């Protein structure tokens, strides 16, 4: 039963990534602006000043985080299905990179948005970071 639950979570989260990529820039920008304004107020209250474009930084951090979450879901799903680590490593990294490429491809068709190789690398670095953290965690348990 847990196998199916992890697989459903993985598929649902991946679809959510693709859904967010299909949003026009106006909708995506509005969400980012609201989040940046809220975070900016929190930082002001805490006495922390941020130089530069907080919205841009927040968008990039959200991409990294989303792909890190997906990387964790990929690792856990393959673990639940008892796929050998060596094979699972390849599958996790390949599927993480594939998701990043497809995500940017979808985004290229969304109004007001573009795709960039740098974004694929940023997205994949989230997957790679979580995969590495997961493997270190697994190794430390033995």
Feature annotation, model-predicted:
Residues 1-72:
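"…centered on the first transmembrane helix and the immediately adjacent amphipathic helix/loop
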Residues 25-29, 79-82, 108, 112, ...:
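Transmembrane helix-loop junctions in multipass membrane proteins, especially transporters and channels
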Residues 12-17, 88-108:
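Small-polar-interrupted transmembrane alpha-helices in polytopic inner-membrane proteins
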Residues 1-2, 79-87:
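Membrane-interface helix-boundary motifs at transmembrane edges
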Residues 2, 59-62, 91-96, 119-123:
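Alpha-helical transmembrane segments of multi-pass integral membrane proteins
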